Amino acid sequence: MHFSSCVLVSALAIVTNVATASPPPLHQLSRPALKDSTIFRSTVHCADCPEGNCYKCTLGHNNTLIANTGGMAYLRALVGFQLPVPAKKVKQCTVQFPAFVKLMEAPINITVSEAKSNDWDEDTVTGENAPDSGEPFSTSHVPALTNPPALDATEACKNAAENGDFSIYVGAQFGRFEIWSKDSGNPAILHTYYK
C-alpha cells in the first residue's frame, strides 16, 4: 500500500508541474520607424504652406512630430514601420517614442489608429493625400510631467501588408503634444513580440 501511495503522489506532482508550467516566452525584435510626418489639417491660414493652405504642408522632414486636437487645427503623427517577422507570427507590438520635446504640465491621452495604407512618402505626404485612418484602437493615459509609455500597436501589426509594411496615426484625445521625430535622430521604435 505504501508503494502505491508514493506512485500516486509522484504522478500527481508531475501532473501539477505540467499544469502550472509557464508557456514558452515570446521572442522580441525591435526596429526603428522607417518614415514619419506630421499631418496638418486646419481651416486657418498657414503662412509657411503652399497657397497658405495648411492641408498642403509637407512636414515629413521636421525634427518633431505634433499632435493636436481642438481649436482650429487637427494634427496627428503618421509613422511607418516594417515588421521584422511575418504578421501571422505576431502576438503583440508596441511603439516607443523617445520623449516629449517638453514634458506636459497636465495629463494627456495618446491615441493610436491604423493608417489604411502605407503608400506615402515623407517628401510629399500632406493633409490632402495622407492615407485614411481607422478609429483609435488603443489609448494610453500619460500623467503630467512624464514621457509617453510604450503604445499598443498590435492591431496595426497584425494587419500589415504581405511585405510587413504598415503605418499608424498617433494623436491626442484632447490637447497637444510634440515628440521627437526620425529626422531628429530619435526615431520611434517598434517592439515586436512573436512566437
Curated annotation (Swiss-Prot):
Q: Which residues are glycosylated?
A: 62, 109
Q: Which residues form the signal peptide?
A: 1-21
InterPro entries registered for this protein in UniProt: CBM96 (IPR055372)
The subcellular localization recorded is:
Secreted
Nucleus among keywords: no
Q: Name one Pfam family in it.
A: CBM96
Annotated GO CC locations: extracellular region
Q: What is its main location?
A: secreted
UniProt keyword Ligase, yes or no: no
Task: Give the span(s) annotated as Disordered.
Answer: 119-141
Q: Which UniProt keywords apply?
A: Glycoprotein, Secreted, Signal
Write out the coiled-coil annotation as residue ranges: none
By what name is this protein known? Answer: Uncharacterized secreted protein ARB_00595
Species name for this entry? Arthroderma benhamiae (strain ATCC MYA-4681 / CBS 112371)
